[in-house]
A protein has these predicted regions:
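Nucleic-acid modification enzymes, centered on SAM-dependent nucleic-acid methyltransferases
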Residues: 1-203, 212, 216-237
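Hydrophobic beta-strand segment of the Class I
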Residues: 207-208
Length: 237
């Protein structure tokens, strides 16, 4: 929570703005529902007190995140620590509070999968590789930009629910030689030259020869998220 600079009401900030290497943020972003004040504003003493209180237990939160991935194995410690270090301590606190709550609940498989989907979205949004002002493309490197935004994960929960419940057209996919009945994707497990002969006389709108590879940041984070959600052993399968 933060306070509106205009009316003084306690509201939720959509994010806090940081400079890499600094111990405290320099700004906050919000849309006040009471007086409609919005945009960037300077940080307040009250905001600083809240952050400093959480920073006192930062080592504990990072150790918990690390042990969830490594267990007793220290072989990959340096790589895992580098990935965890791109998360602000407040994000780690929220993520592991929610995961601990979920582990203590009796849930059906379907409900557990839905909660895990929301958590994945929060893990995606909660790291500090999002530059400010925000860029259109997903970050490609596992590094903190000079200016970055720490997103409010409590507000991101609402966005995650909207994302996962959005109605999108279903894309049919098949494996060669079975073709989609309408518009769709057919996977051909072979070489392009063989496909050219096999598909002679057929109408194919587009051919994708090389699948895009996940960038370094996303690939590393996927491994981290899987370990956090399901444990190191299951994540490695």
């Amino acid at each position: 929570a933060t306070r509106c600079a205009s009316c003084g009401a306690e509201i939720q900030a959509s994010g806090f703005l940081w400079t890499r290497g600094e111990k405290l943020p320099h700004g906050r972003i919000y849309d006040c529902p009471h007086c409609s004040d919005s945009g960037e504003h300077a940080i307040t003493d009250e905001d600083i007190q809240r952050i400093e209180q959480l920073q006192r237990s930062e080592l504990m939160h990072r150790s918990r995140a690390l042990s969830k991935v490594l267990g007793g194995n220290i072989a990959d410690r340096e790589t895992v620590e580098a990935a965890i270090n791109i998360y602000p301590v407040r994000s780690l606190y929220v993520l592991f509070t929610l995961m601990n709550k979920m582990e203590g609940m009796t849930l059906s498989d379907q409900r557990r999968e839905l909660l895990e989907a929301i958590l994945l979205s929060l893990m995606y949004s909660g790291n500090a590789i999002w530059s400010w002002p925000e860029e259109r493309e997903r970050p490609r490197l596992l590094s903190i930009p000079t200016q970055y935004i720490e997103k409010n994960l409590w507000l991101e929960i609402d966005q995650a629910i909207r994302t996962w419940t959005a109605e999108v057209p279903r894309v049919e996919y098949t494996t060669w030689p079975t073709m989609p009945t309408k518009n769709g994707v057919c996977l051909y497990p072979g070489r392009m030259r063989d496909l050219a002969q096999a598909a002679e006389g057929m109408r194919i709108d587009q051919v994708l020869c090389v699948f895009p590879r996940p960038n370094q940041a996303f690939w590393t984070l996927c491994s981290l998220w899987a370990s956090w959600l399901w444990g190191r052993e299951k994540a490695g399968k």
